[in-house]
C-alpha cells in the first residue's frame, strides 16, 4: 500500500490564475488589480475590439495609429512660415506661369518644389523647368538633363541650409530685410577712387559719382574711403568728413535729416518683423535699391585731392591711418563700434522712437544680431568730427603717453645764433618737456633750461592786449614779439595748395591698389 498522497484534479478553486483585465464603458479599466482612470483628450486612433467569434481566427495586420497632422495655413511666428495675404500661393502661381511647358512632369518624392516656399517656389520652379528642358534635347538630353537635375537639387540643398542657418541659430534669425540693411553697410569699402584725365588714371581721395549713395541739401552719404569734392560758385571744395560714410558742407551742419531717415528705416523694419512679413518688405527694399530715389543736387568732381581726415596730421595719426587703410572695412566697423556709447545717448536725447522701438522689439525676441546691426546703422550717421581710426588712435596714444617714462638722458639746450638746438635738431623750449607726464615729474631736475627765461621774456602777458569784441576772426601775426614759443602766438591761416603746384611726391592715403 502506497503512502503517496492521492493526486487531486485541478479545479478553478485551487488554480493560481492571474486576475483578468476589466474594461469599463466609460474608458476606465482594471489592469493588474489597479484601476486606471479613462484617458482624457482627443484620441488619435481606436483599435477595434475583436468579437468572441473572431478570437479563434488568426489576427490580421494591425493598422497603425494615425499621427497628428501638422496644421496647415498661417503659422505665425514659426520658422518657415508662409507669407500672409496669399503671398505663398501667389508666388506658387507665379513660378508655375514662369516655368516652361516641359516642366510639368513630377520628379517624385524628391522633387525640390515640394519643400519650397515663398521665393523658393520661383527659384525651384525655374531650376527644375530648366532641367526638364535640357532633358528634351535630342542625343545629349540624358547627360544634360541629369546634370541640370543635380544642379536643381544642389540649389535646393543650399536653400535648405540658408533656411536652417537663418531660422535656428539663437539670436541670428536673419531675413531678407536684415540682409537688405546689411547691404547699406557692406558697400565696397576696399575699392579706391581713380580719376581719368586725358587717358591717364590718377589715384585720388575724391569720391566718384558711382560712390555717392544719397544727397541732401547739406549732406552727402558716400562709400567709405573717399571724400566728396563739390563744385560751388565756380570753385571746387572738399566737404568735411563727419563719418567714414557721411560728409557735410561744414562742421555746423546737423545730421538730424539723415537720422530721421534711419528712424523711418528701422521703424519700418520693426513693423515688418512684428507682422512677420520681413521677407516681403526686404524684397521690396532690395528691388527699390536698383532705382534712384532723388535727383542729383550737387556737382561732384575729382580735382580737389581731398584728405580723408581733417585737422592736424601727426606721425602717429598718419601711420595709424595708413595701417587702417589696408583694411577699410575693418576701419569702418571699428569706427562705428567706438561710437556706440555716444550713439545710445543720442538716441534718448534726440527722441529717435523708430530706433528705440526696433532695439526694444529685437531685444525682447532675442535677435541680438539685429540689435547690433541697428546700432551700427545709427552710428554710421553719428555727427562728430573725430570719427576716423586715426583720431581714435591719436586719442589712445595721448592717454597712453601719460604713463610713458620718457627719456632719461640729460637734456642740454644750446643757443647758437638765436636758435635753440638739441643734438643738432632745432627745438623750442616747450617741446623739450614733451617726453611724457612721468618724465616731467622725475626728470625735471636733469633738464637744463638755461636760456629759456631770456627767450620767454619777450612774450607779453594777458594784460598787454586790448579787450576784443565782435565775432572771432583770424589774425595775421605781424609784431616782432609774435614768436612760436609764446602763448599768444597766432598761427597763420592754412591755404589750399593745388597738387599740381607741389614739388615732390603726393601721398595719397587711400586703400592700396
Curated annotation (Swiss-Prot):
Lumenal topological domain: 190-358, 380-513
Chain intervals for the UniProt region annotation (Disordered): 2-75
GO cellular component terms attached to this protein's record: host cell endoplasmic reticulum membrane; host cell lipid droplet; host cell mitochondrial membrane; host cell nucleus; membrane; ribonucleoprotein complex; viral envelope; viral nucleocapsid
Residue span of region HVR1: 385-411
Residues spanning the membrane: 169-189, 359-379
Region (Interaction with EIF2AK2/PKR): 2-58
Region (Important for fusion): 265-296
Positions carrying N-acetylserine: 2
Positions of the pro-segment in this chain: 178-191
Cysteine disulfide links: none
GO MF, one annotated term: RNA binding
InterPro entries, sorted: HCV_Core_C, HCV_core_chain_A, HCV_core_N, HCV_Env, HCV_NS1
Region (Interaction with STAT1), start-end ranges: 2-23
Interaction with APOA2 as annotated region, ranges: 122-173
Site residues by UniProt (Cleavage): 177-178, 191-192, 383-384
Compositional bias per record (Basic residues), positions renumbered to this chain: 7-16, 58-68
Highest rank taxon of the organism: Viruses
Identification of the protein by name: Genome polyprotein
Source species: Hepatitis C virus (isolate HC-J2) (HCV)
Organism taxonomic ancestry: Viruses, Riboviria, Orthornavirae, Kitrinoviricota, Flasuviricetes
Amino acid at each position: 500500500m502506497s503512502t503517496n498522497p492521492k493526486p487531486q484534479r485541478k479545479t478553478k478553486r485551487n488554480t493560481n490564475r492571474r486576475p483578468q483585465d476589466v474594461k469599463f464603458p466609460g474608458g476606465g479599466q482594471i489592469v493588474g488589480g489597479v484601476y486606471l482612470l479613462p484617458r482624457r483628450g482627443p484620441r488619435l486612433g481606436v483599435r477595434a475590439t475583436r468579437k468572441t467569434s473572431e478570437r479563434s481566427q488568426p489576427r490580421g495586420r494591425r493598422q497603425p495609429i494615425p499621427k497628428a497632422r501638422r496644421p496647415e495655413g498661417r503659422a505665425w511666428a514659426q520658422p518657415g512660415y508662409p507669407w500672409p495675404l496669399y503671398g505663398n500661393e501667389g508666388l506658387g502661381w507665379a513660378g508655375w506661369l514662369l516655368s516652361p511647358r516641359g516642366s510639368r512632369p513630377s520628379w517624385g518624392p524628391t522633387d525640390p518644389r515640394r519643400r519650397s516656399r515663398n521665393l523658393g517656389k520661383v527659384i525651384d520652379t525655374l531650376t527644375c523647368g530648366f532641367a526638364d528642358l535640357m532633358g528634351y534635347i535630342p542625343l545629349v538630353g540624358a547627360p544634360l538633363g541629369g546634370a541640370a537635375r543635380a544642379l536643381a537639387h544642389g540649389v535646393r540643398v543650399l536653400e535648405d541650409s540658408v533656411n536652417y542657418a537663418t531660422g535656428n541659430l539663437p539670436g541670428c534669425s536673419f531675413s531678407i530685410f536684415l540682409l537688405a540693411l546689411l547691404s547699406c553697410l557692406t558697400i565696397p569699402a576696399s575699392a579706391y577712387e581713380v580719376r581719368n584725365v586725358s587717358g591717364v588714371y590718377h589715384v585720388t581721395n575724391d569720391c566718384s559719382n558711382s560712390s555717392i549713395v544719397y544727397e541732401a541739401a547739406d549732406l552727402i552719404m558716400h562709400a567709405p574711403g573717399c571724400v566728396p569734392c563739390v563744385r560751388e560758385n565756380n570753385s571746387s571744395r572738399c566737404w568735411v568728413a563727419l563719418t567714414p560714410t557721411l560728409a557735410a558742407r561744414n562742421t555746423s551742419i546737423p545730421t538730424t535729416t539723415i537720422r530721421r531717415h534711419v528712424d523711418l528705416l528701422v521703424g519700418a523694419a520693426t513693423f515688418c518683423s512684428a507682422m512677420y512679413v520681413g521677407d516681403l518688405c526686404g524684397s521690396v527694399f532690395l528691388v527699390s535699391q536698383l532705382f534712384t530715389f532723388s535727383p542729383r543736387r550737387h556737382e561732384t568732381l575729382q580735382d580737389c585731392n581731398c584728405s580723408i581726415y581733417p585737422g592736424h596730421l601727426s606721425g602717429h595719426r598718419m601711420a595709424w591711418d595708413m595701417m587702417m587703410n589696408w583694411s577699410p572695412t575693418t576701419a569702418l566697423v571699428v569706427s562705428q563700434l567706438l561710437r556706440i556709447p555716444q550713439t545710445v545717448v543720442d538716441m534718448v536725447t534726440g527722441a529717435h522712437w523708430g530706433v528705440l522701438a526696433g532695439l526694444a522689439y529685437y531685444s525682447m525676441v532675442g535677435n541680438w544680431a539685429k540689435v547690433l546691426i541697428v546700432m551700427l546703422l545709427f552710428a554710421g550717421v553719428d555727427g562728430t568730427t573725430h570719427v576716423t581710426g586715426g583720431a581714435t588712435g591719436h586719442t589712445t596714444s595721448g592717454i597712453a603717453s601719460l604713463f610713458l617714462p620718457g627719456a632719461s638722458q640729460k637734456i642740454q639746450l644750446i643757443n647758437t645764433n638765436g636758435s635753440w638746438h638739441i643734438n643738432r635738431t632745432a627745438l623750442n623750449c616747450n617741446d623739450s618737456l614733451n617726453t611724457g607726464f612721468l618724465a616731467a615729474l622725475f626728470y625735471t631736475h636733469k633738464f637744463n633750461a638755461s636760456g629759456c627765461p631770456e627767450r620767454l621774456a619777450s612774450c607779453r602777458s594777458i594784460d598787454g592786449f586790448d579787450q576784443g569784441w565782435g565775432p572771432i576772426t583770424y589774425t595775421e601775426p605781424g609784431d616782432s614779439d609774435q614768436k612760436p614759443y609764446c602763448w599768444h602766438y597766432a598761427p597763420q591761416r592754412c591755404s589750399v595748395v593745388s597738387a599740381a603746384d607741389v614739388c615732390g611726391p603726393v601721398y595719397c592715403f587711400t586703400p592700396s591698389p
